[in-house]
Amino acid sequence: MVPLTERRSTRQVYLTIALLCAIAGSVDALAYLRLGRLFVANLTGNTVFFAYHLAERHWLSALERLAIILSFFSGVITDRFVQRWIASGRRAWNPAVVSLIIECGVLCALAFLSTYGSLRVALLVTLAWTMGLQNDAFQTVGPVSLNTAFITGDIQKLGIAIASQPADEQATKKRRQQVISLATAWLAYVVGAILGAVGSQTFALRALLIPAALVLIALAMELRARN
């Protein structure tokens, strides 16, 4: 793959993080409110409920949770295959851009589907796959390493960054950037979830067009940040 040069200011780093986390927050909220009270990006709770439903012999509910977990997992793997395919052909493409294009197309398509019967499960697993794809595509944004589809690890990293003791001015600057980035991730997830909840009340599943629009903005920024 032809090396990609990144041209991303600190402000663009923060905005990209905010957009990606708002996307995930809105998708997760919409899935929870419209598709049976299940999350598609936060797998810790799904794992706990998978175990609970197994213990209670609620086999279909357990299978739903397991399907979401495996779909998120397969989204991560898909993104890795996309990266490998681009690299093997020496294509001058940005893998993150490809993943965002896929994500936007999927969200737009799902916004116009029904939520009844087996199609509801198909929507859940497809959204989970999309979140896995996004999270792997943006393991780092500029110099910041974080998750954009779920935030438990980001909150942990935020605590570590706040409690750290920088040895010099450069380390202090790096810590400040990490703190702002990780705090932005959490706040944006909250805002995204609010957008998803409000959109769900007004537009039902068509509110998936809200995160799709945010993906388009993130895509435009990604195209500007790299050549």
For every predicted segment, state its role.
Residues 2-227:
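Alpha-helical transmembrane segments of multi-pass membrane proteins
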